[in-house]
Regions:
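Conserved short-loop catalytic and cofactor-binding motifs
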Residues: 7-8, 29, 33, 48-52, ...
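PIN-domain endoribonuclease scaffold, especially VapC-family toxins
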Residues: 42-51, 56-62
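Gly/Ser/Thr-rich beta-alpha loop segments that engage phosphate groups in nucleotides
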Residues: 8, 33, 37, 84, ...
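Conserved functional loop/turn residues at catalytic and ligand-binding sites
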Residues: 27, 36, 49, 72, ...
Length: 139
């Protein structure tokens, strides 16, 4: 849908939001690198406690590398989720690359984990829950 001002409206899954907030509250750092331009999405993510948000990204690997340098991380310490061709370089660069069930075939082929959930339908929750369960940090 498009708003009266011509802005593309997006929905966000409440369960995804809970999982992101829960992860942040438990010491995980979440960053967003998106080609999108929706400031309402940015506001929602800020409200969840995400402050590393890069919109209008045309070359995501640049922001990926900036985040790694900023926080003194190695590629192996990063988990990335993506669903389309522009995400492939960062999926391949990360220690773990994930995608939703409805990602394009090229992304699925590059990913280490394909969620059974579609994007916007609890995929982020699925991935965060899997990681936190493995680390004995889930509820």
């Amino acid at each position: 849908m498009i708003s009266e001002t011509g802005e593309l409206l997006r929905t966000m899954n409440v369960k995804d939001g809970f999982a992101m907030k829960f992860a942040i509250d438990n010491g995980y750092k979440i960053g967003i690198i998106s080609g999108g331009t929706n400031e309402a999405v940015k506001k929602r993510l800020n409200n969840l406690g995400i402050d590393e948000i890069h919109l209008r990204s045309h070359d995501k690997i640049i922001h990926f590398n900036d985040i790694i340098k900023k926080y003194g991380l190695s590629n192996e310490e990063i988990l990335v989720m993506g669903d389309d061709v522009p995400d492939i370089p960062i999926i391949k660069a990360a220690g773990v690359g994930c995608c939703p069930q409805d990602a394009v075939p090229e992304v699925k082929a590059a990913a280490n984990y394909v969620s059974q959930k579609n994007g916007g339908d609890g995929c982020v929750r699925d991935v965060i829950e899997q990681v936190m369960k493995i680390q004995n940090k889930w509820i």
